[in-house]
Amino acid sequence: MAQAVEEWYRQMPIITRSYLTAAVVTTVGCTLEIISPYHLYLNPKLVVQHYEIWRLVTNFLYFRKMDLDFLFHMFFLARYCKLLEENSFRGRTADFFYMLLFGATVLTSIVLIGGMIPYISETFARILFLSNSLTFMMVYVWSKHNPFIHMSFLGLFTFTAAYLPWVLLGFSILVGSSTWVDLLGMIAGHVYYFLEDVYPRMTGRRPLKTPSFIKALFADDNVVVAQPPNAGIGAGARFGAMGLDPQAQ
Protein backbone atom coordinates (compact mmCIF):
# COMPACT_ATOMS: atom_id res chain seq x y z
CA MET A 1 0.00 0.00 0.00
CA ALA A 2 2.75 2.43 1.01
CA GLN A 3 4.68 1.58 -2.14
CA ALA A 4 1.61 2.24 -4.29
CA VAL A 5 1.07 5.65 -2.67
CA GLU A 6 4.75 6.51 -3.14
CA GLU A 7 4.59 5.51 -6.80
CA TRP A 8 1.41 7.55 -7.29
CA TYR A 9 3.10 10.56 -5.71
CA ARG A 10 6.31 10.20 -7.72
CA GLN A 11 4.38 9.98 -10.98
CA MET A 12 2.68 13.33 -10.43
CA PRO A 13 3.87 16.16 -12.69
CA ILE A 14 6.05 18.76 -11.00
CA ILE A 15 3.52 21.57 -10.43
CA THR A 16 0.81 19.26 -9.12
CA ARG A 17 3.25 17.47 -6.82
CA SER A 18 4.72 20.72 -5.52
CA TYR A 19 1.34 22.36 -4.84
CA LEU A 20 -0.11 19.26 -3.19
CA THR A 21 2.98 18.86 -1.01
CA ALA A 22 2.96 22.51 0.05
CA ALA A 23 -0.76 22.34 0.87
CA VAL A 24 -0.42 19.17 2.95
CA VAL A 25 2.69 20.39 4.80
CA THR A 26 1.07 23.75 5.56
CA THR A 27 -2.19 22.24 6.79
CA VAL A 28 -0.45 19.55 8.86
CA GLY A 29 1.83 22.22 10.33
CA CYS A 30 -1.20 24.23 11.42
CA THR A 31 -2.92 21.16 12.83
CA LEU A 32 0.16 20.33 14.93
CA GLU A 33 0.36 24.02 15.94
CA ILE A 34 3.82 24.36 14.42
CA ILE A 35 2.43 27.16 12.27
CA SER A 36 -0.44 29.48 13.13
CA PRO A 37 -3.15 30.13 10.52
CA TYR A 38 -3.10 33.73 11.77
CA HIS A 39 0.31 34.08 10.11
CA LEU A 40 -0.99 32.72 6.81
CA TYR A 41 -4.33 34.34 6.01
CA LEU A 42 -4.75 37.17 3.51
CA ASN A 43 -4.64 40.51 5.30
CA PRO A 44 -4.10 43.52 3.00
CA LYS A 45 -3.19 45.83 5.88
CA LEU A 46 -0.43 43.53 7.12
CA VAL A 47 0.84 42.98 3.58
CA VAL A 48 1.08 46.69 2.78
CA GLN A 49 1.95 48.26 6.12
CA HIS A 50 4.03 45.49 7.70
CA TYR A 51 5.47 43.98 4.51
CA GLU A 52 4.17 40.49 5.30
CA ILE A 53 4.36 39.61 1.61
CA TRP A 54 4.26 35.86 2.24
CA ARG A 55 0.53 36.11 2.96
CA LEU A 56 -0.06 36.60 -0.77
CA VAL A 57 1.17 33.01 -1.20
CA THR A 58 0.33 31.20 2.03
CA ASN A 59 -3.39 31.95 1.84
CA PHE A 60 -3.46 29.61 -1.18
CA LEU A 61 -1.82 26.76 0.75
CA TYR A 62 -4.04 26.33 3.80
CA PHE A 63 -7.19 24.20 3.45
CA ARG A 64 -8.45 24.55 7.02
CA LYS A 65 -8.39 21.75 9.59
CA MET A 66 -7.36 18.15 8.95
CA ASP A 67 -10.52 16.09 8.58
CA LEU A 68 -12.39 14.07 5.97
CA ASP A 69 -13.30 17.26 4.13
CA PHE A 70 -9.59 18.08 3.88
CA LEU A 71 -8.83 14.68 2.35
CA PHE A 72 -11.58 15.19 -0.22
CA HIS A 73 -10.16 18.60 -1.11
CA MET A 74 -6.67 17.13 -1.52
CA PHE A 75 -8.03 14.45 -3.83
CA PHE A 76 -9.94 17.09 -5.73
CA LEU A 77 -6.87 19.33 -6.02
CA ALA A 78 -4.54 16.51 -7.07
CA ARG A 79 -6.95 15.11 -9.65
CA TYR A 80 -7.85 18.26 -11.57
CA CYS A 81 -4.45 19.89 -11.24
CA LYS A 82 -2.85 16.72 -12.62
CA LEU A 83 -5.38 16.44 -15.44
CA LEU A 84 -4.69 19.97 -16.61
CA GLU A 85 -0.92 19.63 -16.33
CA GLU A 86 -0.78 16.26 -18.12
CA ASN A 87 -3.32 16.99 -20.84
CA SER A 88 -4.17 20.61 -21.64
CA PHE A 89 -0.70 21.80 -20.60
CA ARG A 90 1.37 18.77 -21.53
CA GLY A 91 4.86 19.92 -22.48
CA ARG A 92 3.94 23.44 -21.28
CA THR A 93 4.75 23.41 -17.59
CA ALA A 94 5.70 27.10 -17.64
CA ASP A 95 2.32 27.98 -19.16
CA PHE A 96 0.53 25.97 -16.47
CA PHE A 97 2.50 27.68 -13.71
CA TYR A 98 1.64 31.03 -15.29
CA MET A 99 -2.05 30.06 -15.34
CA LEU A 100 -1.96 29.42 -11.59
CA LEU A 101 -0.03 32.65 -11.01
CA PHE A 102 -2.54 34.59 -13.10
CA GLY A 103 -5.47 32.97 -11.29
CA ALA A 104 -3.98 33.74 -7.88
CA THR A 105 -3.44 37.36 -8.94
CA VAL A 106 -7.03 37.73 -10.18
CA LEU A 107 -8.47 36.19 -7.01
CA THR A 108 -6.34 38.38 -4.75
CA SER A 109 -7.26 41.49 -6.74
CA ILE A 110 -10.98 40.72 -6.52
CA VAL A 111 -10.80 40.34 -2.74
CA LEU A 112 -8.73 43.50 -2.30
CA ILE A 113 -10.97 45.61 -4.54
CA GLY A 114 -14.16 44.09 -3.12
CA GLY A 115 -12.97 44.95 0.36
CA MET A 116 -13.03 48.64 -0.57
CA ILE A 117 -16.57 48.68 -1.99
CA PRO A 118 -19.36 49.72 0.41
CA TYR A 119 -22.10 47.19 1.19
CA ILE A 120 -20.02 44.19 0.10
CA SER A 121 -16.74 44.99 1.88
CA GLU A 122 -17.72 42.94 4.93
CA THR A 123 -18.33 39.89 2.76
CA PHE A 124 -14.89 40.09 1.20
CA ALA A 125 -13.29 40.81 4.57
CA ARG A 126 -14.43 37.36 5.70
CA ILE A 127 -12.55 35.66 2.85
CA LEU A 128 -9.26 34.80 4.53
CA PHE A 129 -8.02 31.93 2.38
CA LEU A 130 -8.30 31.50 -1.39
CA SER A 131 -7.03 27.93 -1.71
CA ASN A 132 -10.45 26.49 -2.50
CA SER A 133 -11.14 29.26 -5.03
CA LEU A 134 -7.92 28.49 -6.90
CA THR A 135 -8.86 24.81 -7.00
CA PHE A 136 -12.30 25.73 -8.32
CA MET A 137 -10.64 27.81 -11.02
CA MET A 138 -8.77 24.69 -12.18
CA VAL A 139 -12.05 22.79 -12.34
CA TYR A 140 -13.60 25.57 -14.42
CA VAL A 141 -10.72 25.64 -16.90
CA TRP A 142 -10.73 21.83 -17.12
CA SER A 143 -14.47 21.83 -17.83
CA LYS A 144 -13.95 24.34 -20.65
CA HIS A 145 -11.25 22.17 -22.20
CA ASN A 146 -13.29 18.97 -21.84
CA PRO A 147 -16.91 20.11 -22.30
CA PHE A 148 -18.33 16.91 -23.78
CA ILE A 149 -17.30 14.37 -21.13
CA HIS A 150 -20.43 12.83 -19.60
CA MET A 151 -20.71 12.88 -15.80
CA SER A 152 -23.28 11.77 -13.25
CA PHE A 153 -24.31 13.19 -9.90
CA LEU A 154 -25.27 10.65 -7.23
CA GLY A 155 -26.69 8.54 -10.03
CA LEU A 156 -29.64 10.95 -10.14
CA PHE A 157 -28.86 12.75 -13.37
CA THR A 158 -26.17 13.04 -15.99
CA PHE A 159 -24.63 16.11 -17.53
CA THR A 160 -21.62 17.10 -19.58
CA ALA A 161 -18.46 18.49 -18.01
CA ALA A 162 -19.28 21.95 -19.35
CA TYR A 163 -21.86 22.21 -16.56
CA LEU A 164 -19.63 20.80 -13.80
CA PRO A 165 -18.87 24.18 -12.15
CA TRP A 166 -22.58 24.98 -12.00
CA VAL A 167 -23.41 21.59 -10.52
CA LEU A 168 -20.77 22.11 -7.83
CA LEU A 169 -22.09 25.61 -7.16
CA GLY A 170 -25.60 24.21 -6.79
CA PHE A 171 -24.32 21.56 -4.40
CA SER A 172 -22.69 24.27 -2.25
CA ILE A 173 -26.02 26.08 -2.08
CA LEU A 174 -27.80 22.83 -1.24
CA VAL A 175 -25.57 22.04 1.73
CA GLY A 176 -25.54 25.63 2.96
CA SER A 177 -21.89 26.41 2.18
CA SER A 178 -20.72 29.85 1.16
CA THR A 179 -20.95 30.27 -2.59
CA TRP A 180 -18.43 33.10 -2.71
CA VAL A 181 -15.50 30.67 -2.84
CA ASP A 182 -16.96 28.90 -5.87
CA LEU A 183 -18.03 32.12 -7.59
CA LEU A 184 -14.58 33.66 -7.25
CA GLY A 185 -13.02 30.54 -8.75
CA MET A 186 -15.46 30.65 -11.65
CA ILE A 187 -14.73 34.32 -12.30
CA ALA A 188 -10.96 33.79 -12.28
CA GLY A 189 -11.31 30.70 -14.45
CA HIS A 190 -13.48 32.47 -17.00
CA VAL A 191 -11.17 35.48 -17.20
CA TYR A 192 -8.26 33.14 -17.92
CA TYR A 193 -10.23 31.04 -20.41
CA PHE A 194 -11.41 34.12 -22.29
CA LEU A 195 -7.98 35.74 -22.51
CA GLU A 196 -6.13 32.51 -23.31
CA ASP A 197 -8.58 30.67 -25.59
CA VAL A 198 -11.40 32.93 -26.79
CA TYR A 199 -9.72 36.30 -27.33
CA PRO A 200 -6.80 34.91 -29.40
CA ARG A 201 -9.26 33.17 -31.75
CA MET A 202 -11.16 36.44 -32.16
CA THR A 203 -8.19 38.75 -32.70
CA GLY A 204 -5.15 36.59 -33.41
CA ARG A 205 -3.43 38.12 -30.38
CA ARG A 206 -2.53 36.32 -27.16
CA PRO A 207 -2.42 38.69 -24.17
CA LEU A 208 -1.40 36.02 -21.65
CA LYS A 209 1.87 34.99 -23.25
CA THR A 210 4.05 33.41 -20.59
CA PRO A 211 7.01 35.67 -19.68
CA SER A 212 10.42 34.40 -20.75
CA PHE A 213 11.80 34.46 -17.20
CA ILE A 214 9.10 31.97 -16.15
CA LYS A 215 9.81 29.75 -19.14
CA ALA A 216 13.47 29.77 -18.14
CA LEU A 217 12.51 28.09 -14.86
CA PHE A 218 11.14 25.01 -16.60
CA ALA A 219 12.79 22.71 -19.13
CA ASP A 220 9.75 22.19 -21.33
CA ASP A 221 9.44 20.49 -24.67
CA ASN A 222 7.23 22.48 -27.01
CA VAL A 223 4.54 19.87 -27.39
CA VAL A 224 0.98 20.60 -28.43
CA VAL A 225 -1.34 17.73 -27.60
CA ALA A 226 -4.87 17.37 -28.94
CA GLN A 227 -7.40 16.48 -26.28
CA PRO A 228 -8.54 12.86 -26.55
CA PRO A 229 -12.30 12.41 -26.30
CA ASN A 230 -12.03 10.63 -22.95
CA ALA A 231 -9.45 12.93 -21.35
CA GLY A 232 -10.11 13.04 -17.65
CA ILE A 233 -11.97 9.78 -17.28
CA GLY A 234 -11.90 8.94 -13.61
CA ALA A 235 -11.54 12.61 -12.71
CA GLY A 236 -15.04 13.79 -12.09
CA ALA A 237 -15.62 13.70 -8.36
CA ARG A 238 -15.45 16.87 -6.39
CA PHE A 239 -15.67 14.66 -3.37
CA GLY A 240 -15.85 10.90 -3.65
CA ALA A 241 -18.79 10.88 -1.28
CA MET A 242 -20.79 13.07 -3.63
CA GLY A 243 -21.07 10.36 -6.25
CA LEU A 244 -20.05 12.76 -8.97
CA ASP A 245 -18.43 10.55 -11.58
CA PRO A 246 -17.55 10.79 -15.25
CA GLN A 247 -18.90 8.24 -17.67
CA ALA A 248 -17.28 6.93 -20.79
CA GLN A 249 -18.84 8.34 -23.89
Swiss-Prot record:
<feature type="transmembrane region" description="Helical; Name=1">
    <location>
        <begin position="22"/>
        <end position="42"/>
    </location>
</feature>
<feature type="topological domain" description="Cytoplasmic">
    <location>
        <begin position="174"/>
        <end position="249"/>
    </location>
</feature>
<feature type="topological domain" description="Cytoplasmic">
    <location>
        <begin position="1"/>
        <end position="21"/>
    </location>
</feature>
<feature type="transmembrane region" description="Helical; Name=4">
    <location>
        <begin position="153"/>
        <end position="173"/>
    </location>
</feature>
<keyword id="KW-1133">Transmembrane helix</keyword>
<dbReference type="InterPro" id="IPR007599">
    <property type="entry name" value="DER1"/>
</dbReference>
<keyword id="KW-0812">Transmembrane</keyword>
<feature type="topological domain" description="Cytoplasmic">
    <location>
        <begin position="118"/>
        <end position="122"/>
    </location>
</feature>
<keyword id="KW-0472">Membrane</keyword>
<feature type="topological domain" description="Lumenal">
    <location>
        <begin position="144"/>
        <end position="152"/>
    </location>
</feature>
<comment type="similarity">
    <text>Belongs to the derlin family.</text>
</comment>
<protein>
    <recommendedName>
        <fullName>Derlin-2.1</fullName>
    </recommendedName>
</protein>
<feature type="transmembrane region" description="Helical; Name=3">
    <location>
        <begin position="123"/>
        <end position="143"/>
    </location>
</feature>
<keyword id="KW-0346">Stress response</keyword>
<dbReference type="InterPro" id="IPR035952">
    <property type="entry name" value="Rhomboid-like_sf"/>
</dbReference>
<feature type="transmembrane region" description="Helical; Name=2">
    <location>
        <begin position="97"/>
        <end position="117"/>
    </location>
</feature>
<comment type="function">
    <text>May be involved in the degradation process of specific misfolded endoplasmic reticulum (ER) luminal proteins.</text>
</comment>
<feature type="topological domain" description="Lumenal">
    <location>
        <begin position="43"/>
        <end position="96"/>
    </location>
</feature>
<dbReference type="Pfam" id="PF04511">
    <property type="entry name" value="DER1"/>
</dbReference>
<dbReference type="GO" id="GO:0036503">
    <property type="term" value="P:ERAD pathway"/>
</dbReference>
<dbReference type="GO" id="GO:0005047">
    <property type="term" value="F:signal recognition particle binding"/>
</dbReference>
<keyword id="KW-0256">Endoplasmic reticulum</keyword>
<dbReference type="GO" id="GO:0005789">
    <property type="term" value="C:endoplasmic reticulum membrane"/>
</dbReference>
<dbReference type="GO" id="GO:0030968">
    <property type="term" value="P:endoplasmic reticulum unfolded protein response"/>
</dbReference>
